[in-house]
Swiss-Prot record:
Its EC number is 3.1.1.96. It comes from Paracidovorax citrulli (strain AAC00-1) (Acidovorax citrulli). One of its GO terms (cellular component) is cytoplasm. GO terms for molecular function: D-tyrosyl-tRNA(Tyr) deacylase activity; Gly-tRNA(Ala) deacylase activity; Ser(Gly)-tRNA(Ala) hydrolase activity; tRNA binding. This is D-aminoacyl-tRNA deacylase.
């Protein structure tokens, strides 16, 4: 399971001109389920991103997590994170989870995030979305939790 974390001052997701999710300071997280992922990988990814210390403390050092700050989470499904660009000029997405599996894992990820964190907004799975954000830093961090027994390529 993969997440691309972006520390933001604010972010929102629009579908057909309607805002469906909006946060102030916090994390915009693009989320991708890969083939072979289970709820265990989703849980580990969420635990990692909630505790990752990428927000400044009083001394200006990255020493606080989104949980520490009470910042928002904006979770957006993004199967293209699983792109394989090694051959040719057209990316392959065969490593992304099948749509039904991806939806199930994304829904689990969102439900668990809502159980653990006070401010969680989302996009809409498989929708054409426009994501607007104001990066803070910028700080952008890729996370990947691979299923046991698989080779971890990339972030």
């Amino acid at each position: 399971m993969m997440g691309l974390l972006q520390r933001v001052r604010e972010a929102r997701v629009e579908i057909d001109g309607e805002t469906v999710g909006r946060i102030g300071p916090g994390l915009l997280v693009l989320v991708c389920a890969e083939r072979g992922d289970t709820q265990a990988e989703a849980d580990r990814l969420l635990d990692k991103l909630l505790r990752l210390r990428i927000f400044a403390d009083e001394a200006g050092k990255m020493n606080r997590s989104v949980q520490d700050t009470g910042g928002g989470l904006l979770l957006v499904s993004q199967f293209t994170l699983a792109a394989d660009t090694r051959g040719g000029n057209r990316p392959s997405f065969t490593q992304a989870a099948a749509p039904d599996d991806g939806r199930r894992l994304y829904d689990h990820f969102v439900a668990r995030a809502r159980a653990l964190h006070p401010v969680v907004e989302t996009g809409r799975f498989a929708a054409e979305m426009q994501v607007h954000l104001v990066n803070d830093g910028p700080v952008t961090i890729p996370l990947r939790i691979a299923p046991p027994g698989t080779v971890q390529n990339g972030p």
